């Protein structure tokens, strides 16, 4: 062999064998070549797909403790949900498993999480993170199994607190820290459509690319643009929300250029459909903004993990290229999760198969009957820390006081909370958005923690002056989209409405303090600061005058409920009447 050949320094017998092999190939090539060139006779090379599992938990809302139900069965809590997630992680066949959190992980939380600024919730999910999470900048970070995006409630405490929650540190907080100093979240936060006003750059990375055991997968995040009408303006003064579809599509070509074609979107926006059991079915009818957003997505988007509406979603919807997108949402408050299975071609990187199941986390069904020991111990310590405040008995409920609405849209719980805010501010009337009612009051002893769970936002109750005409206008605003109709609980007034009439003329027969509403008269109105700033689209409140701040919402409810004759009965109702 020629000098410099890699074989020239081998024994002569190896050189001879190598030469005979080359000669044999030359002689046989004309015979064998037709078989390689003829598709009919050639055996194609196949590659087994890479199987990837994603476990998506949307709208957790700090639901570490038990107390939730799904289909009238106990469901959820940190220990129960953990038992389900760990069982799914341990399943055979997947090359990689990711846990995805499509927003509202925190906010509107029960006291076990909310009183500690939702650090317990983020610490709970940190327990699922592998060793590569939290290793930003290292080669290992591409194997982190946790990814999350923002929901509207991530902004409840403003940007400074949101940044602290993600990156860690105690900041200016005065709470007890279960882990001190607070280490931050180990999830990789992604969001493509929330940018800093100062420079237009995303607040967090728009996307991440993850190794998936022989394949790569991209996660792109987006929060609902409706956040601007769902949050206090002061909480969003440093950021801008961009169109969800356009923002996601902006980054698809970028991940494609990196050779990634398996694309999953964490979207904090949702819809609704009729629930069912089992794998994803064809032909499902999904309503809501999520369908419109998906319809405009880049053809290379494969999966959308949705959230926000707290509903069931498991469907195939078309994207802008007519290709099917798997869309999921698994209720809320730790009661369920989406178990998503993907097959990825290891050569092309495309997703070749996708299906999901929405799995209820029932407490009385295995594996929920064996709560996760580590999560149970964590919850016990959390409850011990907050017990001195949450365990204080405030009142006794004669019967359940629920948020179940009558046909006219009124509930006993809404009436009670509105009465409490009106009493706190000595106002003529009070308005409460029913979306702020986050738990119900059960018969028996009512603790401070029970009432905090009803009103967990720590909003400030205030009083302002409105004209009679402005009161009427506020009631008419209940039917504007995208809000659900008649979603204001009221106190100190009553009215009749006809939802079939044209906008601006649906409300009639308004009575205040037993007398007909006088359009020219000035009335004092109580509400929380969120509504006063135009939250939920109630812009009329921004025109109120003589604003005076009062107590925090839960304090108003605690004081009022404790002052009532015991045991407390639900308010009589009859404040809202539906015509016809």
Q: Where are these predicted regions, by residue range?
A:
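Acidic, metal/ion-coordinating pockets
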Residues: 36, 43-363, 408-420, 430, ...
């Amino acid at each position: 062999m020629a000098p410099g050949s890699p074989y020239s320094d081998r024994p002569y017998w190896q050189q001879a064998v190598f030469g005979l092999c080359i000669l044999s190939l030359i002689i046989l090539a004309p015979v064998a070549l037709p078989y390689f060139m003829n598709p009919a006779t050639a055996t194609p090379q196949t590659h087994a797909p890479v199987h990837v599992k994603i476990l998506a938990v949307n709208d957790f809302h700090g639901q570490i403790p038990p107390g939730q139900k799904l289909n009238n069965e106990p469901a959820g809590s940190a220990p129960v949900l953990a038992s389900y997630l760990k069982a799914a992680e341990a399943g055979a066949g997947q090359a990689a498993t990711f846990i995805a959190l499509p927003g509202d992980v925190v906010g509107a939380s029960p006291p076990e999480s909310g009183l500690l600024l939702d650090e317990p919730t983020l610490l709970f999910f940190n327990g699922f993170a592998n060793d590569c999470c939290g290793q930003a900048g290292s080669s290992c970070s591409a194997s982190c199994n946790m990814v999350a995006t923002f929901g509207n409630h991530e902004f409840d405490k403003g940007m400074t607190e949101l940044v602290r929650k993600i990156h860690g540190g105690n900041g200016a907080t005065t709470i007890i820290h279960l882990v001190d100093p607070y280490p931050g979240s180990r999830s990789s936060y992604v969001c493509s459509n929330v940018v800093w006003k100062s420079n237009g750059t995303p607040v967090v990375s728009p996307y991440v690319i993850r190794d998936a055991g022989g394949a790569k997968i991209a996660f792109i995040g987006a929060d609902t643009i409706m956040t601007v009408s769902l949050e206090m303006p002061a909480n969003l003064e440093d950021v801008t929300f961009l169109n969800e579809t356009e923002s996601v599509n902006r980054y698809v070509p970028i991940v494609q250029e990196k050779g990634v074609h398996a694309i999953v979107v964490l979207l904090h926006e949702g819809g609704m459909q009729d629930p069912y059991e089992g794998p994803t079915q064809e032909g499902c009818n999904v309503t809501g903004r999520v369908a419109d957003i998906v319809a405009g997505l880049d053809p290379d988007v494969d999966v959308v993990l949705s959230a926000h509406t707290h509903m069931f979603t498991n469907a195939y919807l078309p994207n802008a290229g007519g290709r099917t997108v798997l869309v999921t949402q698994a209720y809320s408050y730790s009661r369920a999760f989406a178990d998503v299975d993907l097959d990825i071609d290891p050569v092309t990187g495309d997703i070749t198969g996708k299906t999901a199941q929405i799995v209820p986390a029932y407490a009385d069904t295995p594996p929920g009957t064996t709560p996760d020991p580590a999560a149970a111990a964590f919850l016990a310590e959390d409850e011990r820390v907050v017990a001195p405040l949450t365990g204080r008995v405030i009142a006794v409920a004669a019967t359940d006081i629920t948020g179940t609405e009558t046909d006219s849209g009124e509930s006993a719980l809404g009436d009670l909370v509105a009465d409490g805010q009106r009493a706190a501010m000595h106002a003529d009337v009070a308005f409460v958005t029913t979306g702020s009612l986050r738990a119900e009051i059960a018969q028996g002893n009512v603790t401070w923690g029970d009432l905090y769970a009803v009103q967990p936002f720590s909003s400030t109750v205030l009083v302002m002056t409105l004209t009679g005409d402005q009161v009427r206008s506020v009631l008419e605003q209940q039917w504007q989209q995208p809000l659900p109709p008649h979603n204001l609980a009221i106190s100190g007034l009553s009215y009749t409405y006809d939802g079939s009439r044209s906008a601006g003329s649906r409300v009639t027969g308004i009575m205040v303090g037993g007398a007909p509403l006088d359009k020219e008269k000035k009335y004092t109105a109580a509400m929380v600061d969120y509504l006063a700033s135009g939250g939920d689209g109630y812009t009329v409140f921004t025109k109120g005058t003589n604003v005076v701040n009062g107590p925090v919402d839960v304090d108003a409810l605690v004081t009022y409920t404790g002052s009532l004759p015991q045991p407390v009965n639900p308010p009589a109702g009859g404040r809202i009447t539906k015509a016809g």
